[in-house]
C-alpha cells in the first residue's frame, strides 16, 4: 500500500546551506519532519550546485513522518542579477534602468530554466525571461 501524503511544503533554501535554524527548522518541525535528516539530504543533493543559489524545494510529507523532496532551478531573477552583475533590481522599473542584458544571455537563462517554465519552446521561454528582466529594470539589447 502506498504511503498517504498529508501535505506539501514549498521553501526556498540556499544551495548547500540548509540548517536547522529559522526559517527551515520551525517550518519542518511543526509538521513533524525530521529537520536534520532533511538538511543532510538537501545539502547532499545540492552539493554540485552553486553555493548560496536560492533553490526552490517542494517537500511532500507523509503520515509516518517520512518525506520526499524535489528540487527546482533557481529563480529567473537570480540568473538575471548574476549575468548583469547586480545586487538588486530597479526601484522604479520602466523609468530607471539599472543595466542591460543581451539576448544571448537571455537564451542561456531560458535554456537553464526550460524544465521549470510553462513554455512549449525556447522562444516562449525567452519572452518570459525578457519580461522578468524588464520588470527588474534591465534593458534587453541585441
From Swiss-Prot:
Q: What PROSITE patterns does the annotation carry?
A: RIBOSOMAL_L11 (PS00359)
Write down the Gene3D superfamilies for this protein, in alphabetical order.
Answer: Ribosomal protein L11, C-terminal domain, Ribosomal protein L11/L12, N-terminal domain
Q: Name one GO biological process term.
A: translation
InterPro entries named among the record's database cross-references: Ribosomal_uL11 (IPR000911), Ribosomal_uL11_bac-typ (IPR006519), Ribosomal_uL11_C (IPR020783), Ribosomal_uL11_C_sf (IPR036769), Ribosomal_uL11_CS (IPR020785), Ribosomal_uL11_N (IPR020784), Ribosomal_uL11_N_sf (IPR036796)
What does the record say about PTM? One or more lysine residues are methylated.
Q: Organism's domain of life?
A: Bacteria
The record ties this protein, via HAMAP family, to: Ribosomal_uL11
Assembly, in brief, is: Part of the ribosomal stalk of the 50S ribosomal subunit. Interacts with L10 and the large rRNA to form the base of the stalk. L10 forms an elongated spine to which L12 dimers bind in a sequential fashion forming a multimeric L10(L12)X complex.
Family, according to the entry, reads as follows: Belongs to the universal ribosomal protein uL11 family.
Its function, per the record, reads: Forms part of the ribosomal stalk which helps the ribosome interact with GTP-bound translation factors.
The record ties this protein, via PANTHER family, to: 60S RIBOSOMAL PROTEIN L12 (PTHR11661), LARGE RIBOSOMAL SUBUNIT PROTEIN UL11M (PTHR11661:SF1)
Protein's recorded name: Large ribosomal subunit protein uL11
Amino acid at each position: 500500500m502506498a504511503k498517504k501524503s498529508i501535505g506539501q511544503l514549498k521553501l526556498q533554501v540556499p544551495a548547500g546551506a540548509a540548517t536547522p535554524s529559522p526559517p527551515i527548522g520551525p517550518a519542518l518541525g511543526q509538521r513533524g519532519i525530521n529537520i536534520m535528516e532533511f538538511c543532510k539530504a538537501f545539502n547532499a543533493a545540492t552539493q554540485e550546485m552553486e553555493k548560496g543559489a536560492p533553490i526552490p524545494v517542494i517537500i511532500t510529507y507523509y503520515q509516518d513522518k517520512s518525506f520526499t523532496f524535489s528540487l527546482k532551478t533557481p529563480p529567473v531573477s537570480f540568473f538575471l542579477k548574476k549575468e548583469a552583475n547586480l545586487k538588486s533590481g530597479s526601484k522604479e522599473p520602466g523609468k530607471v534602468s539599472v543595466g542591460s542584458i543581451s539576448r544571448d544571455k537571455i537564451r542561456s537563462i531560458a535554456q537553464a530554466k526550460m524544465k521549470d517554465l510553462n513554455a512549449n519552446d525556447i522562444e516562449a521561454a525567452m519572452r518570459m525571461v525578457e519580461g522578468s528582466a524588464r520588470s527588474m529594470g534591465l534593458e534587453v539589447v541585441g
